[in-house]
UniProtKB/Swiss-Prot annotation:
Assembly, per entry: Heterohexamer of two alpha and four beta subunits.
Protein name, UniProt field: Prefoldin subunit alpha
Taxonomic lineage of the native organism: Archaea, Methanobacteriati, Methanobacteriota, Stenosarchaea group, Methanomicrobia
Gene Ontology CC annotations of this record: cytoplasm; prefoldin complex
Entries under Gene3D superfamilies matching the protein: 1.10.287.370
Function: Molecular chaperone capable of stabilizing a range of proteins. Seems to fulfill an ATP-independent, HSP70-like function in archaeal de novo protein folding.
Pfam families membership: Prefoldin
Keywords: Chaperone, Cytoplasm
Length: 142
């Protein structure tokens, strides 16, 4: 009986560890999803600014000036975009190039998200396996 109790404790400890890993993975997945949404929104904004400029309208936007405050500004050249390349490097690109860069980044993030989702599935299956093992060990559950 003591062996069964010890085995159940071991299964519970392994289950808790898998739960912690799954929660950490879910948080990372949320951050990746936020980045994908940010790419989408940036592409929409670039297209809107470009369309306004091509229609002869002023391309207006709000520019953050700090502490949740913004000013309205007119974009003088909406076809030139400064794109973050990572590692604190940026490059000036045309609007089309910037959209291509953002779409590539989005594809990479989507692949990472798919891999993370597969990992989450494996963790969930591992937890279910541990739960089934624990149920077999408990008296009156067989």
């Amino acid at each position: 009986m003591a062996e069964v109790s010890e085995e159940i404790r071991n299964l519970a400890a392994r289950h808790q560890e898998l739960q912690r890993q799954a929660e950490a993975l879910r948080q990372e997945m949320g951050m990746i999803q936020t980045s994908i949404s940010s790419c989408d929104q940036t592409i929409v904004t670039i297209n809107e600014l470009k369309a306004a400029s091509e229609a002869g309208k002023p391309a207006e936007t709000m520019v953050p000036v700090g502490f949740g405050s913004y000013v309205y500004a007119e974009v003088k050249n909406p076809d030139r975009i400064i794109v973050n390349l990572g590692a604190e490097f940026s490059a000036e690109e045309t609007a089309e190039e910037a959209i291509e860069t953002l779409n590539r980044r989005k594809e990479q993030l989507t692949k990472i998200l798919e891999q993370m989702n597969a990992s989450l599935t494996r963790l969930t299956q591992g937890m279910q396996t541990l739960e089934a093992e624990a149920a077999k060990l408990q008296p009156g559950q067989a």
